[in-house]
Amino acid sequence: MKLANWYWLSSAVLATYGFLVVANNETEEIKDERAKDVCPVRLESRGKCEEAGECPYQVSLPPLTIQLPKQFSRIEEVFKEVQNLKEIVNSLKKSCQDCKLQADDNGDPGRNGLLLPSTGAPGEVGDNRVRELESEVNKLSSELKNAKEEINVLHGRLEKLNLVNMNNIENYVDSKVANLTFVVNSLDGKCSKCPSQEQIQSRPVQHLIYKDCSDYYAIGKRSSETYRVTPDPKNSSFEVYCDMETMGGGWTVLQARLDGSTNFTRTWQDYKAGFGNLRREFWLGNDKIHLLTKSKEMILRIDLEDFNGVELYALYDQFYVANEFLKYRLHVGNYNGTAGDALRFNKHYNHDLKFFTTPDKDNDRYPSGNCGLYYSSGWWFDACLSANLNGKYYHQKYRGVRNGIFWGTWPGVSEAHPGGYKSSFKEAKMMIRPKHFKP
């Protein structure tokens, strides 16, 4: 009912407003004296406004007076709200147009950087763009694959160059050592006025630095035990075991195998620093062996004994071990002795001029594996061995992999069946002393 009344009042007001407008238009050109007779229409307040801002109004149209509802004052507010909404809609339209322009700007540019007109439907343009991106990705993938192949080729060339440079360095060092050896021998032969070795050793000699066991022998030490030596003053001194009895004495022991109390399946760092008990089983250490063989020209003696009581030896008139940079490369001279030259067995098994290999560092010439890992030890392997004094210690003959202490020229070894029992050694010892030492 209220809605119907409100609708009727609104229609009456609008009709009145339209009548006023029409009346005003028709009487615009009437003279002033005729304007006096026009009926006045007034919109006036009929009371005080309430707190909510609702004010009562009435329209006077003599003889008619129409009282408007209080909500009539809200018409102006509604009108303003509609205007605001129209402005918001217009603003959103403009924003949408800007977005469309920006999206067009992000499209594919032409060769000159200008936007090209679209010749197809939006879906077709998107599909074309996807295909172009896929083509670019495939092209980049192909280029990346080619780059990886080139990197691998360069790595291979670099390794070859490093190997060539290493061989050149080794040959250079070997030639320098050989030249120095020749010079020393020449000077020793020309020194005819020098006092004899017997005269030198007959007088007590006081050494400030003992480079090896022969220096202790020279001052009268005859007891086989541990002594402290300093082969290189630039490096720290260290203890060694001296054999003062075998073949005139003065020997510095590098390695000893007696009872299997020490494990020789060790890492590169262990063989580098040394391990074991100097009075029982041990490896002196590759760094120390290098310093000892660098300070003087040394000879090498190897003593072997099997469980049958057979004792044989091998003697080499030169022995030198390079530094770690050259992977402790081995050099031995001419052979003499009773055990046979197992270090230079034949052209296929030759330990001379070979690098040191351990289970965790492969420097041997076997292309399909690590000889140190297979034979459980560190040694100057070829591909793989005709000798290995650092193999496992077996207390009797054994079968399987020949990973025990091994000397390929030992009597009876060549007759053994490959799948049969292998001989083992009771004792093995490596020791050095200066080449020109005289007891």
From Swiss-Prot:
Expression by tissue: Constitutively expressed in cytotoxic T-cells.
Pfam families referenced in this protein's UniProt entry, alphabetically: Fibrinogen_C
Subunit details: Homotetramer; disulfide-linked.
Biological role stated in the UniProt entry: May play a role in physiologic lymphocyte functions at mucosal sites.
SMART domains: FBG (SM00186)
Official protein name in the record: Fibroleukin
Region annotated Disordered, chain positions: 103-126
Signal peptide: 1-23
Domain Fibrinogen C-terminal: 204-436
Entry-linked InterPro entries: Fibrinogen-like_C, Fibrinogen_a/b/g_C_1, Fibrinogen_a/b/g_C_dom, Fibrinogen_C-term_domain, Fibrinogen_CS
GO cellular component: collagen-containing extracellular matrix; extracellular exosome; extracellular region; extracellular space; fibrinogen complex; ficolin-1-rich granule lumen
Residues bearing attached sugar chains per UniProt: 25, 179, 235, 263, 336
Presence of keyword RNA-binding: no
Disulfide-bonded cysteines: 213-242, 371-384
GO terms under biological process: negative regulation of defense response to virus; negative regulation of dendritic cell antigen processing and presentation; negative regulation of macrophage antigen processing and presentation; negative regulation of memory T cell differentiation; T cell activation via T cell receptor contact with antigen bound to MHC molecule on antigen presenting cell
Keyword tRNA processing: no
Subcellular location(s) per record: Secreted
Organism (species): Homo sapiens
Keywords of this entry: Coiled coil, Disulfide bond, Glycoprotein, Secreted, Signal
Principal subcellular localization: secreted
